[in-house]
Design a protein with these regions (language model features):
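SAM cofactor-binding core of SAM-dependent methyltransferases
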Residues: 55-145
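Hydrophobic, Leu/Ile/Phe/Ala-enriched alpha-helical segments that form helix-helix packing faces
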Residues: 50, 96, 119, 123, ...
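Active-site segment flanking the S-adenosylmethionine/decSAM binding pocket
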Residues: 2-11, 131-213
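Long, contiguous hydrophobic alpha-helical segments, chiefly transmembrane helices and signal peptides
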Residues: 58, 62-65, 69-70, 81, ...
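Short, hinge-like loop/turn segments at secondary-structure boundaries
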Residues: 73, 96-97, 124-127, 150-155, ...
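C-terminal substrate-binding/active-site "lid" region of AdoMet-derived donor-dependent transferases
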Residues: 167, 180-263
Length: 263
């Protein structure tokens, strides 16, 4: 009988070196196999509304994966920045009909007053008024108010306690969907408000593909702005890598990015 020779050590070490180590966020950002994949009917209806209003939303794959991550992470305090008319919110409300996954507090932050009215109707439709809120304000203004509240609480806690902060914090899950123009500043403002195990989710901005040399006028200016914004995004990711785990999940239509403090 022929004897099987052991693999040469050099070959086996080469194989182990070629295998990519698992990223710390791989499990948290992965698909949730126990949840249905079909879009909830209310979310689908909102998607049709968006088409009629000529507005965009996160890709279906990204919305569904955010729902999956929310179910796995089970956050107590959730803040959605740039909630729009509730396309993603409807996915989350649908998940949180099951009290096993429901957070203690959920704040939908939206700058548009008319959108805020639509979000309030959505919240009431899911009978979520006891644990959900609609905050109509610019995100940077909300953050400034939270920081002011924290400063007041540190010096005069009895007085500060009489007025609740505008959003629940520290934030266990923060979802940022504000478009490429303001994405970097809004993500940077949200990071310090995360809890120790807090997770920030956002859709990676599209890589600019236009040929600046062939563009003129407004088209050239718009493409230059996109390039500058994407470069700012790359700089932010590099900076965060020193203190945070930054995970990327490429999917059809977009790439979900997860950011969580190391350790």
């Amino acid at each position: 009988m022929a004897r099987l020779e052991p693999e040469p050590p050099a070959a086996s070490s080469m194989e182990s070196e070629s295998e990519e180590p698992e990223h710390p966020l791989d499990g948290l950002l992965s698909k949730h196999d126990e949840l249905v994949r079909k879009e909830p009917q209310i979310a689908a209806n909102i998607g049709e509304q968006l088409k009629h209003m000529d507005l965009e939303s996160l890709p279906l794959t990204v919305r569904r994966r955010i729902r999956d991550v929310a179910a796995r992470h089970k956050p107590a305090n959730v803040v959605e920045v740039g909630a729009g008319i509730g396309h993603l919110s409807a996915w989350l409300f649908d998940l949180w009909q099951d009290e096993e996954f429901r957070p203690d507090r959920y704040a939908m932050v939206e700058a548009g007053g008319k959108f805020g009215i639509i979000l309030t109707r959505l919240m009431r439709r899911y009978e979520a008024s006891k644990w959900a809120d609609v905050v109509v304000a610019e995100w940077l203004d909300v953050v400034a108010n939270v920081n002011a509240w924290n400063a007041a609480f540190a010096t005069t806690p009895d007085i500060a306690a009489l007025e609740a902060p505008p959003i629940p914090h520290p934030i266990d899950l923060c979802i940022v969907d504000v478009g490429w123009k303001r994405q970097v500043e809004c993500v940077m403002a949200a990071i310090p408000l995360l809890s120790n195990n807090g997770l920030l989710l956002t859709n990676e901005p599209d890589v600019p593909t236009g040929d600046l040399a062939s563009l003129e006028g407004d088209e050239a200016s718009s493409e230059e702005a996109k390039v500058a914004a994407f470069n700012e995004w790359i700089t932010l990711v590099k900076m965060l890598n020193d203190t945070h785990n930054v995970g990327f999940v490429p999917m059809f239509g977009g790439t979900l990015v997860g950011i969580q403090r190391k350790g």
